[in-house]
Amino acid sequence: AQGAPAAGALRWELPGWAGSVDLLLIATPDGTEPGLSLLADQAYRRGCTVVAVAPARTPLAEAVEGAHGLFVPMATAPYEQEAPLTASAPGVLWALLTPFLAILDRTGLLTAPPDILEKIAGRLDHIAERCGPAIATYSNPAKTLAAELADALPVIWTEGTSAGPAGRRFAAALAELSGRPSVVAELPEALAAHSTLLSGPLAAGADPDDFFRDRVEEPPALHARVVLLRDRPIGGLSAAPAARDLALSHDTPISELEPESGGEIETLAELIAVTDFAAVYLALASGA
């Protein structure tokens, strides 16, 4: 059994119904969290199967092996060996998620055979070529998005199965990498949830004196900018036109990202990759 974690340390509890027919998946770029080791031990006592992806030779690795679970060492690049990894660091998500995709494919919970994983890798390579630092802003969607968000509060609206998690990931990356706040919601609920926000003090036309602001001495006021992430609509049904109308009716600029056609995981990969690049460019620009 594991010792008690220090006061204030994060702890996780299994739901009361978890038992021998359940599978616990643990993913972390750290592996030293006492709470996760305790969670693996709790799962073992409940009869749950435990699978974890984390750095090798960590307390979590030992706990999972002690629980007779499956431990998969997290893949890292050579330059990442010394630097601490954060959950939103570029590349960390896929190093943690890819083993789970393969495992869940084998268990039948989703479809991600080797050819799908190869397509995901190809899509990520393609985005890296389009969004890399050597590509000029005018043809680089990530640099363009970062420039548009430089002095804005990102209001992230998502539509579609893949866009939802990509939007939440983008908000997390903005906060963790560049220290920037944002709000995120799914369409069509976002239209009602954020309507007042777009008409309040964050609206583009909220400060009439901004026209006379000293551009050198006074920092720009923070205004909202809608970022619309969406999958290709099925059957032509989409709330995107209403979203554009709402934003424009409040003089709020809007940025849109729509992935190329493909499977759900491929489109998810593209949206995450582009927004990850944008978050990194914002972090570099702000010196975070």
Enumerate the language-model features and the residues they cover.
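Glycine-rich phosphate-binding loops that contact phosphosugars or nucleotide phosphates
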Residues: 1-126, 231-234, 241-251
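Short hydrophobic beta-strand segments
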Residues: 26, 153-159, 225-229
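C-terminal hydrophobic structural anchor segments
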Residues: 219-275
